[in-house]
Amino acid sequence: MNGIDGLIVINGINHFPISWLHSKGFCEYQLYLEKIKKIKVEKTTEMIIGKQIHAELEKEFLEQAEEEMTIEEALSRSKETGESFLIRELETISRKYGIYGKIDEVQILPESVVIIDDKPGNVAYQGLIKQVSAYSLSFLEEFKPDREIFSALRNRDNKEVFWNQKFDKNLLEMVVKDILEIHDLIRDVRFPESSTNPQKCLKCRFRKVCDRSLA
């Protein structure tokens, strides 16, 4: 497991980036080739542009940010006063599940918390749902809010939410299953599954080096 990009070890426990859930949702074998086997291929134009846009949005928010407060303070104050608060680029970590990442936006409302992940499209693919659900799980474990949590996917460009669901038992069980499977990949106690969809293989940037490609 040494040298795996993005993997951090805290008190002997592996922690991997929550964004890996998105990759696993597309193709677990792709995740395995990139992160575990450390096979390098060029980034796509979409990936490069997406990273630039994300950095610009983060910079814009930081320039406009006015009042600083902790999550705990925002949760307490919203309950007491009925105010709502918006937090961008919130770093989160779950020591229980061994995951970490940065949440695009957290909306703290008097009766609920909304965890938002910004994406370039409008389709709620399973990998995206699992990624934002993992952010919700990590937030729940770290801050233990006294209200319901909702997971939401939002179009990065027009700011319209195209998927929104209460973080319930079904989402929790679904994402925990994938988290445990990734930890098993890291520990080399299970072999990854590959996609059976040729269309995914055609879109995959690893198709020329993948020994399971159907393209």
What is each model feature region?
Residues N2-G6, N11-G12, E83-G98, V123, ...:
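Metal-dependent nuclease catalytic regions and adjoining charged, substrate-binding loops involved
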Residues L128-E141:
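Short, charged, amphipathic alpha-helix that recurs within catalytic cores of restriction-modification
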